[in-house]
């Protein structure tokens, strides 16, 4: 079964090269929003810290439609500290848009995310963004990207990647570096032509890899992943297994099933091969688990989650300004908030510890 009505892509880039702005424009031109609807900038960055810093921290799922084809889009973080998010979500897609600033060219994180995409043999579409910058180096940057792909061992097919020139802020794209487009039609056409549609057997036993998790105070832990085989249905009994931990086998029931529809998660009764879905009902679910048919337990291989890159210690605030700023200022409240974050961020480690402070000479 080939899903010609579906494409799954991720947008990868160095921080501040315009990923989230491009997703905004793709959603607008794909008809996700009404003509009279006011759309805020960086609509995908929903977290307070993401909006404050102007960066993407957690990978986000959304979708739009072009010429009757649904395009599932994953907006990934561009900062090196959140590289683990990029590694995981690449398992859900069949191709990537590699976004590169027309003036800055490939940057350190560009190399990191591109290496991960090439290692998984994903189709790459090169998007040169911010072509309207006065210091843009269009031809040079294209050469730099191709040289980087060559250094990373890209195959001949990957080196033949199409190039689209784009201004995400103006919502315009073109195949020529010297001709400015009016909309993103060249980019959409390139996605449909070069990104392969998902394939699989919808009648086979269910197989789905959990690549991301979320948490809701209403339904509990939510797993997100792409169906690689079979069909998943609401109220279906499933078995959870893990490739790196073969002894782990638990049973569960899919109590709610959702697909991404623009910025919303819309409830559905069933989904099949190639669909990216979110589900609830299994509280122990975590990234790397396989959801499968109890009659055919086959774990799907998955990359191990990267270890944290930063370590922080929280201790009692003995500043003269202690307790005068912020809403939640006690150590118990901070601890509770960190443990709540563990429910949806499995790359985070939290440990309780006892800090001993030696007495001062006055004591």
Regions inferred by a protein language model and the residue ranges of each:
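Conserved small/polar residues in nucleotide/adenosyl-binding loops
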Residues: 356-363
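Flexible hinge/switch segments at interdomain interfaces of large molecular machines
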Residues: 165, 300-316, 349-352
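Conserved beta-strand/loop subsegment of P-loop NTPase cores
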Residues: 96-99, 121-129, 157-166
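Conserved nucleotide-binding/hydrolysis modules and their immediate coupling elements
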Residues: 209-310, 322-324
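Conserved Switch II/interswitch segment of TRAFAC-class P-loop GTPases
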Residues: 80, 93-111, 125, 131-139
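Canonical P-loop GTPase G-domain recognition
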Residues: 135-191
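Active-site phosphate-binding and catalytic loops of NTP-dependent enzymes
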Residues: 32-38, 44-58, 149-159, 192-206, ...
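P-loop NTPase switch module centered on the Walker A-proximal segment
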Residues: 1-100, 104, 144, 213-216
């Amino acid at each position: 079964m080939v899903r010609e009505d579906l494409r799954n892509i991720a947008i990868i880039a160095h921080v501040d090269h315009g990923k989230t702005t491009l997703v905004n424009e793709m959603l607008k031109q794909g008809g996700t929003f009404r003509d009279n609807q006011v759309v805020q900038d960086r609509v995908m960055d929903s977290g307070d810290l993401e909006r404050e810093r102007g960066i993407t921290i957690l990978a986000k799922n959304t979708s739009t439609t072009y010429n009757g084809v649904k395009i599932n889009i994953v907006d990934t973080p561009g900062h090196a500290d959140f590289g683990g998010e990029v590694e995981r979500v690449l398992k859900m897609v069949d191709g990537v848009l590699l976004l590169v600033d027309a003036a800055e060219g490939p940057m350190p994180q560009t190399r990191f995310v591109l290496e991960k995409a090439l290692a998984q043999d994903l189709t790459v579409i090169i998007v040169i963004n911010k072509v309207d910058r006065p210091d843009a180096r269009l031809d040079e940057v294209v050469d730099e990207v191709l040289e980087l792909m060559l250094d990373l061992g890209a195959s001949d097919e990957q080196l033949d990647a199409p190039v689209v020139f784009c201004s995400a802020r103006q919502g315009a794209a073109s195949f020529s570096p010297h001709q400015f487009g009016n909309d993103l039609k060249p980019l959409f056409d390139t996605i449909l032509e070069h990104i392969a549609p998902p394939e699989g057997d919808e009648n086979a036993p269910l197989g789905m890899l959990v690549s991301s998790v979320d948490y809701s105070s209403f339904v509990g832990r939510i797993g997100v992943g792409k169906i690689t085989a079979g069909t998943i249905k609401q109220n279906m009994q499933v078995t959870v297994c893990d490739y790196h931990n073969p002894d782990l086998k638990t049973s569960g029931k899919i109590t709610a099933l959702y697909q991404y529809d623009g910025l919303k998660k819309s409830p559905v009764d069933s989904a099949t091969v190639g669909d990216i879905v979110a589900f609830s009902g299994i509280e122990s679910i975590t990234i790397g688990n396989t959801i499968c048919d109890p009659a055919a337990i086959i774990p799907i291989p998955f990359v191990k989650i990267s270890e944290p890159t930063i370590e922080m210690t929280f201790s009692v605030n003995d500043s003269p300004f202690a307790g005068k700023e912020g809403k939640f200022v006690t150590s118990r409240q901070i601890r509770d908030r960190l443990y709540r974050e563990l429910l949806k961020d499995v790359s985070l480690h939290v440990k309780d510890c006892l800090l001993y402070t030696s007495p001062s000479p006055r004591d």
